[in-house]
């Protein structure tokens, strides 16, 4: 399942699929956080991801439950959790694997400043 973090510290479920989100925002960076509810490192980095989502409104932050979105996991070759895929128009432009807080923060800042 694909969830989009809104900017009021909540997560809402999308009824639409990822391709529709891309069509709606072709020029925006979309960050996909591939996580699992049972994953300890995913839980550890979740507060930072939420903070980034509320701070950087020029980027769309989504959470993808790997147990419910095998097609997206396959498309982006996700092998571990958490994995963060930075996309533009559906194409992966950057990927981070693991609970890499400093790297995640740095990559988000790079993409925000490039817009």
From Swiss-Prot:
Location of the active site: 39 (nucleophile), 42 (nucleophile)
GO CC, one annotated term: dendrite
Positions of the record's site feature: Deprotonates C-terminal active site Cys: 33
Disulphides: 39-42
KW 4Fe-4S (keyword) present: no
GO terms of biological process kind: determination of adult lifespan
CDD domains: TRX_family
Tissue: Expressed in ASJ and ASI ciliated sensory neurons. Expressed in the intestine (at protein level).
Keyword field: Disulfide bond, Electron transport, Redox-active center, Transport
InterPro entries: Thioredoxin, Thioredoxin-like_sf, Thioredoxin_CS, Thioredoxin_domain
Residue ranges of domain Thioredoxin in the record: 2-114
GO molecular function, one term: protein-disulfide reductase activity
Induction: Up-regulated in response to dietary restriction and during dauer formation.
Pfam families, per database record: Thioredoxin
Superkingdom, natural source: Eukaryota
Gene3D superfamilies named in the record: Glutaredoxin (3.40.30.10)
Phenotype caused by lack of the gene: Increased nitric oxide-evoked calcium flux to cytoplasm in ASJ sensory neurons. Decreased avoidance of P.aeruginosa. Decrease in lifespan. Suppression of lifespan extension induced by dietary deprivation or in an eat-2(ad1116) mutant background and partial suppression in a daf-2(e1370) mutant background. Enhancement of the constitutive dauer formation phenotype in a daf-11(ks67), daf-11(m47), daf-11(sa195), daf-7(e1372), daf-1(e1287) or daf-8(e1393) mutant background at 15 degrees Celsius.
Site residues by UniProt (Contributes to redox potential value): 40-41
Family the UniProt entry places it in: Belongs to the thioredoxin family.
Protein purpose: Participates in various redox reactions through the reversible oxidation of its active center dithiol to a disulfide and catalyzes dithiol-disulfide exchange reactions. Shown to facilitate the reduction of insulin disulfide bonds. Might play a role in the reversible nitrosylation of cysteine residues in target proteins, and thereby contributing to the response to intracellular nitric oxide.
Name of the protein this chain belongs to: Thioredoxin-1
Organism, scientific name: Caenorhabditis elegans
Gene: trx-1
